Regions:
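Phosphate-binding active sites in nucleotide-utilizing proteins
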Residues: 143-246, 254-255
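Conserved phosphate-donor/acceptor-positioning beta-strand/loop module used by diverse small-molecule
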Residues: 242-267, 325
Length: 388
């Protein structure tokens, strides 16, 4: 991107990608410089405003907040562009601790995103979860010792549950390559990115040796000499397949206060069109129920396989909880794992700036700050629930 920028800094897509690359690497100041060039040359690029908002501190400068508010007045904007600006504005008001305005904007953002994906259907998700359970209902897994060093480690759970923090901690180990959120398993088990299992992923058709070798080769592309760490949270759907294909793989389930998780999901805009359930309150609640039910199923089928990592314990007692994580992964202790902020692994997450900071406790019980502004379905339902 740097070479292309030096040749021609008038290319819109190049500028977006260049700014994005800086953000992934944690170089937010250079990202902002590129995004300011984008704003000047391509003022109607709405994505650039969202990217800028993710790394800008609106306590210090509200000029860009005003620019976005003026952009939002354009009635010709698509639902997607309106949503993008609304989520960016929500973040700006969060910086200013104006939670009422922040709530107002991310509710509007979700409404516009749901209009963008007007064909979103939670019933497809329900059918997929039922199919996965039916595949493994009668299957009896072999008991195998997991004393060897794994080739693969998976961090699973709901989005916004703490998977990025855990990823940065474990990938600080010298033997681990933090690959971020990989699409490898999703692509292996679903038909053309649809919510339907591939025929060769069904147990009756599954050639374990051939299938595992094929998938492992896709992981090893990233670093064949290291343990590959995949933090795609929705891999919780594939725990049965993971253990069947890779019995030595380590699976870590991040367990966070469900009310905080639901809030964090609802107040953020995701890149993936596969996460359309996040933009509708009833769909979000239903997906959480599906997730909890499937995790309960896996724990019954594989009682000693999954490591339960409590997010609140991790942020309150980082050293002891980190040592437990490293021990579970059959790795020797390294002091690097305590200070994950020195980890230069690229990060793609909706909370880029937070992921580069030391462990912070401000996200614990965050839902309490928003309940008064969000007297809607999510909290009528979730306030009654326990963690899991």
């Amino acid at each position: 991107y740097k070479a292309g920028f030096e040749i021609d800094n008038n290319h819109e897509t190049l500028l977006i990608n260049y700014a994005g690359a800086f953000q992934i690497k944690g170089d937010f100041e250079n990202s902002k410089k590129i995004l300011k060039i984008l704003h000047e040359k391509f003022p109607n690029n709405i994505i650039a405003h969202k990217m800028y908002s993710s790394v800008n501190n609106y306590n210090k400068n509200i000029e860009h907040q005003t620019v976005m508010q003026n952009k939002l007045k354009n009635e010709k904007l698509s639902y997607f562009d309106k949503a993008t600006l609304c989520f960016a504005l929500a973040k700006s008001y969060t910086d200013q601790k104006n939670h009422k305005e922040s709530s107002n904007y991310f509710i509007k953002g979700n409404e516009n995103m749901f209009k963008t994906y007007k064909n979103a259907n939670i019933n497809k998700q329900i059918e997929l979860f039922q199919k996965i359970k039916s595949e493994f209902e009668l299957y009896k897994f072999e008991n195998k010792n997991q004393n060897d060093e794994p080739r693969l480690i998976f961090i699973v759970g709901l989005p916004r549950s703490g998977t990025t923090l855990t990823h940065q901690i474990i990938s600080s180990h010298s033997k681990v390559y933090g690959a971020g959120e990989l699409p490898v398993l999703k692509n292996a088990f679903l038909k053309n990115n649809q919510l339907e299992l591939r025929e060769d992923a069904l147990i009756k058709n599954l050639n374990v040796g051939k299938f595992s070798s094929k998938i492992l080769s896709k992981f090893m592309v990233y670093d064949k000499n290291s343990i590959i760490l995949d933090k795609a949270p929705l891999n919780f759907m594939w725990i049965g397949h993971i253990h069947l294909l890779f019995p030595d793989a380590k699976i870590i389930h991040i367990n966070r206060n469900i009310k905080d998780t639901a809030l964090s999901i609802y107040k953020n805009m995701f890149d993936a069109s596969a996460l359309t359930w996040t933009y509708n309150q009833e769909h979000l609640i239903k997906f959480i129920e599906l997730y909890k039910d499937l995790m309960k199923f896996w724990k019954l089928k594989l009682p000693n396989l999954i490591y339960e990592c409590d997010y609140e314990k991790l942020v309150n007692d980082q050293e002891n909880e980190t040592k437990k994580l490293i021990k579970f992964c059959n790795l020797d202790w390294e002091d690097n794992c305590i200070d994950h902020t020195k980890n230069k692994t690229g990060i793609k997450t909706v909370s880029l700036a937070q992921a580069r900071k030391p462990v912070y406790k401000s996200s614990v019980n965050l839902y309490e700050t928003y309940v008064q502004y969000l007297p809607f379905l999510i909290f009528h339902y979730l306030v009654q629930t326990e963690k899991h």
